[in-house]
From Swiss-Prot:
Residues 17-201 form the RNase H type-2 domain. The gene is rnhB. This is Ribonuclease HII. Keywords: Cytoplasm, Endonuclease, Hydrolase, Manganese, Metal-binding, Nuclease. It comes from Pseudothermotoga lettingae (strain ATCC BAA-301 / DSM 14385 / NBRC 107922 / TMO). NCBIfam families: PRK00015.1-3. It is found in: Cytoplasm. Its EC number is 3.1.26.4. CDD domains: RNase_HII_bacteria_HII_like (cd07182).
Length: 224
């Protein structure tokens, strides 16, 4: 039991009442969405930063959290990441997670810094190592995002999404170079954009070439 994480949350609960932990998964990836979770955790579980847990342990804790806590989920798509940038898309996902939880008077503990969300709270650097609620949110967000990436591995089998989950591994970068990016990739990210051309953008979007996302990518290509 990581009691120090619950003691950290207890301080905020004593001062502000209900506390929501918020975290995201997938911010640094080259493909797929950003997934955020908002968690109200009232029972003590053996939670910790999802990055320091095995996949099996994350799955076990995910089920425990979903069965014993109040959970909200928010997703920002690759299209939204390209349109609004990764920082703003992360805020969109987190605000959606909070909105789905619908606890407007609760106090938010969010992992990170300088994130102004839709309700009162505080940003905590390395919050997933300090707060039980944030740690629980990190587990939920990570597990759900991993499942999304595994599902898309069946749609785009050349890229190995089930293995690297969209991160910029050597295998993934080689696949992007060999097969070209997909609409599931974050086309505005430099390692992806560098493998695009005007023709490839037209091929990707075909009849939707006049959509805002295509226009953004074409502008980036022309200025690169």
């Amino acid at each position: 039991m990581r009691s120090e994480l619950f003691a950290y949350d207890r301080f905020y609960k004593q001062n502000f009442g209900t506390v929501i932990g918020v975290d995201e998964a997938g911010r640094g990836c080259l493909a797929g969405p950003v997934v955020a979770a908002a968690v109200i955790l009232e029972v003590q579980l053996d939670v910790f930063d999802s990055k320091q847990l095995t996949a099996q342990k994350r799955e076990e804790l995910f089920l425990q959290i979903m069965n014993s806590a109040e959970v909200g989920i928010g997703i920002a798509t690759p299209e939204e990441i390209d349109l609004y940038n990764i920082f703003n898309a992360t805020k969109i996902a987190m605000n959606r997670a909070l909105a789905s939880l619908n606890k407007k008077d609760a106090y938010v503990l969010v992992d990170g810094k300088s994130l102004n969300l839709s309700q009162q709270g505080v940003c905590i650097v390395k919050g997933d190592e300090k707060s039980a609620s944030i740690a629980a949110a990190s587990i939920v967000a990570k597990v759900l995002r991993d499942r999304i990436m595994v599902a898309h591995d069946r749609i785009y089998p050349c890229y190995g999404f089930s293995k690297h989950k969209g991160y910029g591994t050597v295998h993934h970068l080689n696949a992007i170079r060999e097969f070209g990016p997909t609409v599931f990739h974050r086309l505005s990210f430099s390692p992806v954009l560098s493998n695009l051309s005007v023709k490839k953008v037209h091929d990707l979007f075909s009849e939707n070439i006049n959509c805002e996302r295509a226009k953004v990518i074409l502008r980036k290509l022309s200025s690169s």
